[in-house]
Regions:
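Nucleotide phosphate-binding/pyrophosphate-handling subdomain across enzymes
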Residues: 2-12, 20, 24-31, 255-257, ...
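Phosphate-binding loop of NTP-binding sites
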Residues: 2-5, 13, 20, 27-33, ...
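Conserved N-terminal Rossmann-fold NAD(P)-binding element of oxidoreductases
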Residues: 11-16, 448
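NAD(P)-binding Rossmann-fold cofactor-contacting core
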Residues: 33-48
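Conserved beta-strand positions in the Rossmann-like core of class I SAM-dependent methyltransferases
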Residues: 34-37, 138, 390, 423
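Beta-strand->loop->alpha-helix junctions that form or flank phosphate-binding loops
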Residues: 38-39, 57-60, 95-99, 140, ...
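Short acidic low-complexity segments
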Residues: 55-66, 150, 430, 435
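C-terminal helical cap/extension that packs against the catalytic core
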Residues: 380-441
Length: 464
């Protein structure tokens, strides 16, 4: 789909408060486009946009798009949205975020990070290495980087590092120069319908990578291995713990606040090379894989091992990725975005590896009824490394469905499959009461979820 854009257009973002939409809006504003938007409620992303003089209306209303000439819609926007319907009625051009993103980055050399999990951290790690190498890239990420306090920034070079969004299939329209596939998991089934359809989309994405670029695919994921059989251009390299990986992880050491590892590089045209004593200030094997993806792409464009290692060592992290918020009774409280069984398992595995003698208390807010119902078996086993799970009410994320799902039954299944203590709470006051009565001694607390749980954790000290 070809998009014709003039700087005189008034481009309206429906659902501008999402992390991906807000990042794209900010970049387009800095490129000189006339941007405005709307969302159902205020948040930190919207406040950041307002500081950049982007007009935003809270609430969706057809009057909001009265003077608009182009509409960009979030994947979270339903077809009965009043602004969407008004735009259709007035025959305004309507584009998905991924379509507009593809247009913006099509004239840049880029690194596109795709996958079910780990995209945000991987995008951030690649960006940090590029910055260390004095390649000032444009960055469009799915999380706020602590190094510059935003999810997006306009760079001075002709490079763009961006995180894709697979939720509506539009990521296949982004033309990558270099592409990364972290993993493929059962997500966004409401759109794809089956894991096979999802895998086929990733095949298209990888096949879009040109001969002068390269794809980097993690070999530690079964679904990733499956798509290798279908990729037609064969222009890819692999990474991971798997011994067949072109960039193989080994000699892993994890401490409380950092990880050290080595990489063995085996390329078809060269003799074996090694990058040793790579240090990252984050924990978990999943993050070591993310860092290895960043090493692979950076090495392939010619960045030196020293600059790669410096970029990783000085990484300042991403908000809501195992972020320490406060301590109570000397017990640390962390906030994490994990909301899928695979993500939860990986975070807890990493925490257990370095906090071996601590009891793990997980405060979990499920995100979407449909996800919990469709993956209830996987969820019921995901918390095996935790000692206590505090279950918060489901964050519905706009879903007005019941699906005949009983939350209390899920709690029972969690107890049965993971053999852990499960406590149901109804609100923040319940959480404060639980904390006062139970959080002390040799414990570590992690809030998990993609909804409002981050606010619950951050506001908890005021209730204690």
């Amino acid at each position: 789909m070809k998009i014709e854009l003039a700087k005189s257009e008034l481009i309206h973002f429906v659902g501008i408060g999402g992390i991906g939409m807000s990042g794209l809006a900010l970049i387009m504003k800095e490129l000189g486009f006339n941007i405005q938007g709307s969302d159902i409620s205020n948040n930190k992303n919207i406040e950041r946009l307002k500081k950049n003089k982007i007009k935003i209306n809270i609430g969706h209303n057809k009057q909001n798009i009265k003077k608009s000439t182009i509409i960009v819609i979030s994947s979270a926007i339903h077809k009965n949205n009043t602004e969407y319907l008004e735009a259709k009625k007035n025959k305004l051009p309507i584009y998905k975020r991924g379509e507009m993103l593809a247009h913006i980055v099509s004239l840049m050399k880029n690194v596109v990070v795709a996958g079910s999990h780990g995209k945000t951290t991987t995008t951030s790690l690649v960006s940090n290495i590029f910055l260390k190498a004095r390649i000032d890239p444009t960055v469009i990420n799915g999380g706020v980087l602590n190094s510059f306090g935003n999810s997006a920034k306009l760079g001075k070079s002709n490079w763009c590092i961006l995180e894709s969004d697979e939720s509506d299939g539009s990521f296949v329209k982004i033309p990558p120069t270099y592409s990364i596939v972290t993993n493929i998991d059962e997500e966004h089934m409401d759109f794809y319908g089956s894991i096979e359809n999802l895998k086929n989309s990733f095949v298209k994405f990888v096949n879009n990578t040109p001969s002068f670029g390269k794809s980097f695919i993690c070999l530690d994921n079964k679904n990733n291995k499956d798509i290798l059989k279908k990729i037609s251009n064969m222009n890819y390299l692999t990474y991971g713990v798997d011994k067949k990986s072109n960039f193989r992880i080994f000699n892993v050491v994890q401490k409380v606040d950092y990880s050290i590892f080595d990489i063995k590089i085996s390329l078809p045209s060269n003799k074996k090379k090694y990058i040793k004593n790579i240090k990252i200030p984050i924990i978990g094997l999943h993050n070591i894989r993310n860092a290895t993806a960043a090493v692979a792409v950076s090495s392939s464009i010619g960045i030196s091992n020293k600059l790669i290692k410096d970029g990783l060592k000085n990484f300042q992290g991403v908000q809501r990725r195992f972020t320490k918020i406060f301590s109570f009774q000397k017990v640390p409280f962390f906030d994490d975005y994990a909301h899928h069984p695979t993500e939860i398992k990986e975070v807890l595995n990493g925490v257990k590896e370095v906090y071996k003698n601590k009891k793990i208390v997980c405060i979990f807010q499920p995100h979407r009824i449909s996800r919990l119902k469709n993956l209830k078996r996987e969820f019921s086993k995901a918390f095996a490394k935790a000692d206590v799970v505090v279950l918060c009410p489901i964050y519905k994320a706009g879903e007005n469905i019941n699906l005949g799902f009983k939350y209390s039954n899920f709690a029972k299944e969690l107890i049965r499959n993971s053999k852990i203590k499960v406590i149901l709470i109804n609100n923040r006051l319940d959480l404060a009461k639980f904390t006062r009565q139970n959080i002390y001694g040799d414990k570590i607390v992690i809030g998990m979820g993609a909804g409002s749980i981050s606010n619950w954790i951050r506001e908890l000290p005021a209730l204690l």
